[in-house]
């Protein structure tokens, strides 16, 4: 199952919780990167894309509710 389909099955509350956790992780990754402690720099990109995917799924649900 893809990440997008898994997120589409999650509730909005669960998506919000996951997004908050990802924002915190992104902050920590940026801090580690700035202090040259980050080994896996590609994780920054992965986290950014997961946040974007969550925002997209939430937007799809809001658009669907308005119709």
Swiss-Prot record:
Record bears the keyword Thylakoid: no
This protein's encoding gene: rpmC
Organism: Magnetococcus marinus (strain ATCC BAA-1437 / JCM 17883 / MC-1)
A Gene Ontology BP annotation from the UniProt entry: translation
Protein name according to UniProt: Large ribosomal subunit protein uL29
Superkingdom of source: Bacteria
SUPFAM superfamilies: Ribosomal protein L29 (L29p)
An example molecular function term from Gene Ontology annotations: structural constituent of ribosome
Any one annotated GO CC term: cytosolic large ribosomal subunit
């Amino acid at each position: 199952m893809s990440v997008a389909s898994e997120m589409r099955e999650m509730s909005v509350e669960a998506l919000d919780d996951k997004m908050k956790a990802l924002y915190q992780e992104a902050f920590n990754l940026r801090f580690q990167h700035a202090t040259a402690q980050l080994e896996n720099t590609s994780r920054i990109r992965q986290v950014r894309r997961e946040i974007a995917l969550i925002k997209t799924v939430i937007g799809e649900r809001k658009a669907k509710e308005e119709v």
